[in-house]
Swiss-Prot record:
Residues the entry annotates as binding a quinone: 215, 264-265
Residues annotated to bind chlorophyll a PD1: 198
Topology versus the membrane: Multi-pass membrane protein
Binding site for chlorophyll a ChlzD1: 118
Function: Photosystem II (PSII) is a light-driven water:plastoquinone oxidoreductase that uses light energy to abstract electrons from H(2)O, generating O(2) and a proton gradient subsequently used for ATP formation. It consists of a core antenna complex that captures photons, and an electron transfer chain that converts photonic excitation into a charge separation. The D1/D2 (PsbA/PsbD) reaction center heterodimer binds P680, the primary electron donor of PSII as well as several subsequent electron acceptors.
Misc. comment: 2 of the reaction center chlorophylls (ChlD1 and ChlD2) are entirely coordinated by water.
Localization per Swiss-Prot or TrEMBL: Plastid, Chloroplast thylakoid membrane
InterPro entries found in the cross-reference section: D1/D2 (IPR055266), Photo_II_D1/D2_sf (IPR036854), Photo_RC_L/M (IPR000484), Photo_RC_L/M_CS (IPR055265), PSII_D1 (IPR005867)
Catalytic activity: 2 a plastoquinone + 4 hnu + 2 H2O = 2 a plastoquinol + O2
PTM per Swiss-Prot/TrEMBL: Tyr-161 forms a radical intermediate that is referred to as redox-active TyrZ, YZ or Y-Z. C-terminally processed by CTPA; processing is essential to allow assembly of the oxygen-evolving complex and thus photosynthetic growth.
Domain of life: Eukaryota
Organism per entry: Huperzia lucidula (Shining clubmoss)
Identification of the protein by name: Photosystem II protein D1
């Protein structure tokens, strides 16, 4: 029998690049999504840092009253932010080359659009990269599905809401106090606390925190001891070991007696699916709620819904919230409005000349 050996031609430069990009042996997986993710996230991060430190004030409301957001213009870490693009720009695509000068671009808040659009592309590619690495390793795709919740939330406040409101100036500022301002104004204009999708998001985040703490504490309390009393129980675990590291039967028995039997999972896979799904679904709903309120489909309005037999209003908590909303609304962008629409009279008074 004769074997014929044929020398394999060396792969082309492109072929070697493809192999390197898709290799799961790299210390950090790159992937085709990573080819776009890396430059977009690096750009967003670099511009954010520079603008947070040194960007000049931005005319956010388009009324020639610039708002300072950077450290060099008097802010600290708490009050500083990347100020959203000016209302004078609206939803226009506003790259540097569309402005007459860099000074004009900075004055109109160009860095905000640059950061937000690169950031959204980057996190979407990060999600795609999670799926891609899972696919290469033969894993199921649910890591990327879970990450879609924060991606949807970011897209809602940075892109969908500005589109619905007609201007990037209504997007969430990139800073701590700016985020709080966004939340307060959002409540004033959309009554988000009375929106059922926001309520589901609160249940998702707080419930997820509770379930995570419950699960972690139950597992930690039911470890199978492999060490002496003089050593930490954590030292008894060896990475990659085949044996269970905790006694799920003991944990199930404890929790079943603490609450009731069927409140406790007896299937580890069902348990971990629940731990992932609860906060993810909640945040999906919140992102959907923001996206609907972007187009002014707002939270429930139960104002003055309880009256006595004489027709006099009996205030409920809904009326208290409404009063707070009106107070917040008259205070924000105080120089941009002659009079808030919500407080304007339905009918103009007649004037007899």
């Amino acid at each position: 029998m004769t074997a014929t050996l044929e020398r394999r031609e060396s792969a082309s430069l492109w072929g070697r690049f493809c192999d390197w990009v898709t290799s799961t042996e790299n210390r950090l997986y790159i992937g085709w999504f990573g080819v776009l993710m890396i430059p977009t996230l690096l750009t967003a991060t670099a511009v954010f840092i520079i603008a947070f430190i040194a960007a000049p004030p931005v005319d956010i409301d388009g009324i020639r009253e610039p708002v300072s957001g950077s450290l060099l213009y008097g802010n600290n870490i708490i009050s500083g932010a990347i100020i959203p693009t000016s209302a004078a720009i609206g939803l226009h695509f506003y790259p540097i080359w569309e402005a007459a000068s860099v000074d004009e671009w900075l004055y109109n808040g160009g860095p905000y659009e640059l950061i937000v659009l690169h950031f959204l592309l980057g996190v979407a590619c990060y999600m795609g990269r999670e799926w891609e690495l899972s696919f290469r390793l033969g894993m199921r795709p649910w890591i990327a599905v879970a990450y879609s919740a924060p991606v949807a939330a970011a897209a809602a406040v940075f892109l969908i809401y500005p589109i619905g409101q007609g201007s990037f100036s209504d997007g969430m500022p990139l800073g701590i106090s700016g985020t709080f301002n966004f939340m307060i104004v959002f409540q004033a204009e959309h009554n988000i606390l009375m929106h059922p999708f926001h309520m589901l998001g609160v249940a998702g985040v707080f419930g997820g925190s509770l379930f995570s703490a419950m699960h972690g504490s139950l597992v930690t309390s039911s470890l199978i001891r492999e060490t002496t009393e003089n050593e930490s129980a954590n030292a008894g675990y060896k990475f990659g070991q085949e044996e269970e590291t905790y006694n799920i039967v003991a944990a199930h028995g404890y929790f079943g007696r603490l609450i009731f039997q069927y409140a406790s999972f007896n299937n580890s896979r069902s348990l971990h699916f629940f731990l992932a799904a609860w906060p993810v679904v909640g945040i999906w709903f919140t992102a959907l709620g923001i996206s609907t309120m972007a187009f002014n489909l707002n939270g429930f309005n139960f104002n003055q819904s309880v009256v006595d037999s004489q027709g006099r209003v009996i205030n409920t908590w809904a009326d208290i919230i409404n009063r707070a909303n009106l107070g917040m609304e008259v205070m924000h962008e105080r120089n941009a409005h002659n009079f808030p629409l919500d407080l304007a009279s339905v009918e103009a008074p007649s004037v007899n000349g």
